[in-house]
Structures are given as structure tokens and as C-alpha cells.
Amino acid sequence: MAVFHAFRALRPTPEKTDLYDERVYEKAKENLDNMEEKGILVQDQKACYYIYELVRKGKTQTGIVGCSSIDDYMNGVVKKHELTREDKEQDRIHHVDSCNANTGPIFLACRYPDSLLTLMNNWKDHHEAAYDFTEEDQITHRVWVIDEDEVISEINKEFAGIDFLYIADGHHRAASAVKVGLKRREQNPGYTGEEEFNYFLSVVFPYDQLCILPYNRIVKDLNGLTVKAFLGALKFNFELMLMPGFPCKPVEKHCMGMYVDGQWYHLKAWPDIYEKKDVVGQLDVSILQEKVLRPVLGIEDPRTDQR
């Protein structure tokens, strides 16, 4: 059962208005405080849910914004699918701890019940969006505030019937928010579980509305190899094709685009290099790590390797 809570958002008014140095985190806290003091961010009077809709290149993605339980994260109701980098995680822990706020939501996905989709659409049809604007990147953002107690209660019941939520983006933000929450629990041994630090900001989208974007890796060097030797090593596990003149984006599983020495290449993994029954091992990210990054480029742990 997924525990999802309404919350009182700090919402922007319509008017627009060394990386790890301690002063960076202090400045973030100062900026947040200033936005509250100036009324740029205004906290709603009661805990609400929010419908968040994005429209990009004709594709619409609509989800519900609320707060997810850190206990759900720890007990596996919120499913993770990638490891985090220690340096990025520590940076975000410091940021959340300093601001005492989740400044960005975790992007979650699940199978939406038809009844929850109907509820969202009905609310949109009968209420005006609190925000409706298009950014310079041509992505349109719309937000509706769900503030009626009866509807909030219905959403609570809908999420109680959902077995799992999956992190689509925000593994570092989620891990950091959870660790700060656990720290707050240590500081407040009499906590009830209802305090805000027991939850992290999330937006849950229907899985079938998601658009998968590339997640690229940049490696600083070829581990002492020449370009010719590097390409030769890849041919043991991949079919290589030179793709002159334009970026190569994969269009099917077990294919990758690679840019090296000013040239684009299309890589297709030979079918005998991964075990068909190994669900994790046949993921493209696993093939990249086990057949390229580790054996050829000498990168044992991408989480900590500075290259």
C-alpha cells in the first residue's frame, strides 16, 4: 500500500521574479527565506493535492503532486532502479538539511486506476488552473489545486490501493530527503510519523504517459588506449557502425550511440554477451557497465570514479 499525503505547498505568485562551499548552501537558504518574506512563495492555508500537467511537442503528461512516506522508500513500496553517486547524494543532503525543504519533487510513476484518472480529469474540467504558462523551452506547465476535503480523502484511498511506486527520476533527491528525514527522527525521538520530515515531495504520473529520455555517460579519457585500440576492444561485444555527420540516438534495446574522437558510432550488443534470463544484466545500462566501462575503461564504480 502506497502512503501518499496532501501538503501545504509554498507556491510562487504569478509574477516572475567552489559548488560545495558552505556559503552555497547558506545562500540557498537565504534565497528561500527571501522568497517567502517577499510573498513570491506563499504557503497554502491547508494541506492540498495538486494536479501537475506538462505539454511538450504535443504530448501531455498529467500527475498528482503530494508527499511520499520515507518508510515506503525504506520498505520497498517506492521502487528504486539505480545506484546513487556519493558526492551528489551528500550535496543534496546538505542542501535539503540547510533549506529545511524539498526544493524539487521526486518523479514517480505507477499504474493509475481508471477511477483516479477520472477524478483528475473531472477536477480539471470543472476548475480553473492556478498556473498556466509556457516556458522558453516550449514546455507548457499547468497546476490545479485540489483543496476539497472529500476529494482529498478519495485520493488518499486511491493511493492506498496502489501497491508500488517507481522512481522515474530523482534517485539522489529521494535518497537525500530520506536521510535527512532519518536525521530529524534521531533529533526528535518522540516523533509520531506525521511530521513533515517523514515525507518527501513527489509527483506521481501514470506510467503509460511517460516519455523516456536519454541518460548519457561522459568519460574523461580512454584509460590509456588509442582510439583504434578502444574501438577494437568494443568489437568483441558490439557491432560497430560509423554514423558520420549527426548524433546517433538508439531506437531499440541493446543499442547505444557513442561519440569519440569527433565521430559518432552506433553500437549494437551481440546477443550472446548477456543472459536472457537475467532481468538486470540485460539492461542497456548494465551492458554498458559490464562490457565497456569496467573491462575496457577501468571504471569499477561509476558512483565514485572521478573520470
Regions found by a protein language model. Name each.
Residues M1-R307:
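Surface-exposed, charge/polar-rich loops and edge strands
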